[in-house]
């Protein structure tokens, strides 16, 4: 799957889950599971409930996503 196939959406973290997984509520109201991307993990970027994040989704499974950016 190429980088053009992903869907980027904005959302808000509503809950921390084990193994660097988070429950994210998107702008359109959908709730999904998001995990931290490798670069964010490598640079020790902390994500807390209430943070605004950018999530990448695949067209195949819209219930899971990758958190790629945390807004300040």
From Swiss-Prot:
Keywords: Cytoplasm, Initiation factor, Protein biosynthesis, RNA-binding, rRNA-binding. It is found in: Cytoplasm. One of its GO terms (cellular component) is cytosol. The keyword rRNA-binding applies. It holds the Pfam family eIF-1a. GO terms for molecular function: ribosome binding; rRNA binding; translation initiation factor activity. CDD domains: S1_IF1 (cd04451). SUPFAM superfamilies: Nucleic acid-binding proteins. Component of the 30S ribosomal translation pre-initiation complex which assembles on the 30S ribosome in the order IF-2 and IF-3, IF-1 and N-formylmethionyl-tRNA(fMet); mRNA recruitment can occur at any time during PIC assembly. Belongs to the IF-1 family. This is Translation initiation factor IF-1 1.
């Amino acid at each position: 799957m190429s980088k053009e196939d992903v869907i980027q959406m904005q959302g808000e973290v509503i809950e921390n889950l084990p193994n660097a997984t988070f429950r994210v509520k998107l702008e359109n109201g959908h709730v999904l599971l998001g995990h931290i991307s490798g670069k964010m993990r490598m640079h020790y970027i902390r994500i807390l409930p209430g943070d605004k994040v950018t999530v990448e989704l695949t067209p195949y499974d819209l219930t899971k996503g990758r958190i790629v950016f945390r807004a300040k």
